[in-house]
Amino acid sequence: VWIDANFSLFLTILISGIILVILIGLLATWLSSRGKFMLLDGIVKNRGAIKEPWAEYKTEGNSLFLFSVVIGLLVLLTFSLIAGISVLIALPDIQSETFGGAGVAAIVVGGSLMLLFILACIAFSAFVKILMVPTMYLKRVRAIEGWKIAWNQLLKGHVGSFILLILMMFLLGLGAGVVATFTVCVTCCIGALPYISSVLFLPITVFFVCYALCYIQQFGGDWTFFKNMCRFCHYNMEGLEEGCACPECGK
């Protein structure tokens, strides 16, 4: 009754809410895209800097953000297409208000397409997170170029090993999930609070990032992430004796 009497107000609130959710989602995606390179930089260079990597990898982070937005729109479009196909198949049953062969066919076809689509999304997400983003970080390239390099040099011809990597990370993830759940229970759910959980489970996050980087490093010297660098000024100390003072800062 209230909606009928105040339809214009309801429509305004609804549209405003949708726009707000979209803006929050875009902001979260942007921060996540920039944050991925900050995390990689912190792990590779063994430092806790924020300002430097935020500015240094601005181009790569923004490129990843735009790439993520486009992919998100394609995912939404594909999902809508699958839903539309299912509705068209079931249309005879919908019009006759019965559940028969058309309805069953719609469920089978729609379910199969959706399952394949979900598996494709998982594989794509793994490729971007494990191979493409580190490639962008190391080669200092934008998203599309990072995609091409990662596809041609890291995935093509090595699909089997990449699948094994994903399976291994999945199994390790199950173990990490058990540890995280146990920790949350032991701390009476305090460990599940946003900031506390980020700090508490940071070693797990770092482990999985390092695991992926170590896999990539097997592809040759051009894919070396963990170089012998000075922990204070990040001077490249390759070829120098271990334990010697840094020629740049003297520490």
Residue ranges and their predicted role:
Residues 230-233, 246-249:
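Short cysteine-rich clusters marking metal-coordination/redox-active sites
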Residues 35, 40, 94-97, 105-144, ...:
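Juxtamembrane transition segments at transmembrane-helix termini in multipass membrane proteins
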Residues 236-238, 251:
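Short functional micro-motifs and their immediate structural scaffolds
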Residues 17, 21, 25, 60-84, ...:
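Hydrophobic alpha-helical transmembrane segments in multi-pass membrane proteins
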Residues 1-5, 26-73, 77-105, 129-157, ...:
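Membrane-interface segments at transmembrane-helix boundaries
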Residues 1-17:
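Interfacial loop/helix-cap signal at membrane boundaries in integral membrane proteins
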Residues 239-243:
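Short, non-ligating residues that shape and space the ligands of small metal-coordination modules
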